[in-house]
């Protein structure tokens, strides 16, 4: 009964994320852009699969991945062996990232890099930086220092790298901090932080996700220097015309076995690692062990449904709409529509509401959750608009990234460090599943129709969306600092103590 209630809650959250975009798409298709009936029917079916898949997946990830992170983190703290903590962190970082659904979707849409090569490259980057995160927690190294040093190195590498790979590299950093990796990394960090007994130990467990997102950027930039690109068709382009319901059913039935195999291979490393750890060291009791295994089954089923819906019916419609809206006067709708989608995507993301509440609590109510929510919505909406502006004009992604990250890192000197840690952790919150599954194909369709370069002009959308919370959260932190200083300067009202109150008629 309890699990059923939890599943219903997750399905409601998934529906709140998916339905706003679906309704916008339906409105566009009925009013502005004629879409083939078969493709639209496929989109409706894909929407249902996305809702069910996301609901099952998020419940399963909470039951399994978060628990595995907690259990292994707690066990590692007891060993107090640095080499063991680092080796396990690397292996877990790689294994958990391979199964990240947002990364699977992004990799399927990159036309010039083999999907498996890109996923493994990104996963190794996360694994290496997860090791660095453990070192930072154990030795209390400044998060700001690490962010400045590594982003400086990343941007130096970016200016020296092949310009065609830049946008994909920064997008990779945005999609890896998704619903699979974030709860796991956070749980592992909290467990390892418990080794320390000083007052800053808990605060240092924040910032792990933000630091880990640098790893994929660096590793993909390195990949661009050594890997020979291979032009290929993206999955968003690969939608064949659907002539009848039998053809529609055939498309989905043929896709299910393919994604069942993909998800099996993606989840296998983390499952094998957990089982080995369970029988060698962890030795959970029967009930907790079974709960984790049931959670893994939920995760598996959810991922299969999610990826099938995305690749067969959801992303292809985004691609088709983007292409159709470049015709004539409709091109001027690309930017406002992208901004509208950005507004609804961030508003519908459940993790965003948790972030808003965190900021409200940190600021002791000086920054309300509502004010934080509106600020994030405006920021992500602006990111969507800037991404489409790039598609139309071909402006380099580096113009926005250099300015944005410079501002984000500069703000870290003026706000409490916990605000900085939460800000860099929250980048993946904003770039939720719908950014990679719909908005990116939408940008790709528009870019191809305009004759642009998809690798340089369409990719980068996820990176812009992920960058905005870094600035927004810290701006709110700066407002909190200003308000706090003003409150300290205001003179307190003199306390005259309790005195006798004289009524007017008594004085007469």
Where are these regions (language model features)?
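Alpha-helical transmembrane segments and their helix-start/interface "positive-inside/aromatic belt" motifs
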Residues: 11-17, 41-47, 75-83, 143-148, ...
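Juxtamembrane and boundary regions of transmembrane helices in multi-pass small-molecule transporters
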Residues: 2-4, 133-149, 164, 168, ...
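Transmembrane helical segments that form the transport core of multi-pass membrane transport proteins
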Residues: 45, 239-351
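Interfacial loop-to-helix junctions that mark the boundaries of transmembrane helices
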Residues: 8-14, 35-45, 77, 110-119, ...
